[in-house]
């Protein structure tokens, strides 16, 4: 694939757009509300548009992109917080991202985005006794298949997994930054969804295969 485009929700200082550029992907727009990170990305990626508050965005009225990335707020999912989960004021913003993605797909007859990438803290897997991560998986699968139901695991969520449906796939795993050139231990969940095929696992599991 070539000439892929990217939109970044909860953009922060532009980590996903910068990584995309390093892989030959063109960032088109971002959503962020904090002034300083916006200044950083405006200087670093001047061609990328900024749409501000995600709650005021309509995914059907912005430029369609191949990939939407989002590291939705983790404060209510983190082991360091009060753990209100997806019902918390900040982490419930996850559902705003789902809304924007659905709006874009509806306006493009399901063509865009084909891919999404979600990033969050490992605590998301245990928040609300694992129910929050089940909700994350189910809401993402429902972008393509409204009838899907994701069951809870018998014990707890594993550090990696894959769902393959009818012409879509979702894969997730925990990655540690220390194995990717960063001098610190920083474990995060990464989830890839492919809404037009079974390539999510191929994308996610081919990188750093030895380090889960």
Describe every region a protein language model picked out.
Residues 2-6:
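Extreme N-terminal starter segment of soluble prokaryotic enzymes
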Residues 8-14:
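Class I SAM-dependent methyltransferase "Motif I" SAM/SAH-binding loop
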Residues 27-28:
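Short beta-strand element of Class I
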Residues 34-35:
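Conserved SAM/SAH-binding beta-strand->alpha-helix loop
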Residues 41-42:
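Conserved SAM-binding loop
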Residues 47-53:
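Conserved SAM-binding strand-loop segment of SAM-dependent methyltransferases
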Residues 57-65, 79-209:
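Class I S-adenosyl-L-methionine
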Residues 67-69:
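N-terminal Rossmann-like NAD(P) cofactor-binding module of classical short-chain dehydrogenase/reductase
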């Amino acid at each position: 694939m070539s000439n892929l485009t990217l939109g970044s929700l909860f953009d922060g200082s532009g980590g996903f757009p910068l990584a995309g550029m390093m892989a030959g992907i063109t960032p088109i727009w971002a959503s962020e509300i904090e002034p300083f990170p916006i200044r950083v990305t405006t200087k670093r990626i001047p061609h990328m548009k900024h749409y501000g508050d995600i709650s005021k965005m309509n995914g059907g009225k912005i430029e369609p992109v191949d990939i939407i990335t989002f590291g939705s707020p983790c404060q209510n999912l983190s082991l360091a917080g009060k753990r209100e989960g997806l019902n918390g004021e900040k982490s419930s913003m996850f559902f705003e991202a789902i809304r924007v993605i659905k709006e874009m797909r509806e306006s493009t007859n399901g063509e865009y985005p084909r891919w999404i990438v979600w990033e969050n803290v490992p605590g998301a897997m245990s928040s609300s006794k694992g129910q929050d991560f089940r909700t994350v998986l189910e809401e993402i699968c429902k972008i393509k298949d409204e009838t899907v139901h994701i069951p809870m695991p018998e014990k707890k969520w594993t550090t990696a997994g894959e769902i393959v449906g009818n012409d879509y796939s979702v894969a997730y795993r925990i990655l540690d930054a220390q194995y990717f050139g960063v001098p610190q231990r920083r474990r995060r969940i990464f989830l890839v969804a492919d809404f037009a095929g079974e390539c999510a696992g191929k994308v996610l599991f081919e990188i750093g295969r030895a380090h889960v």
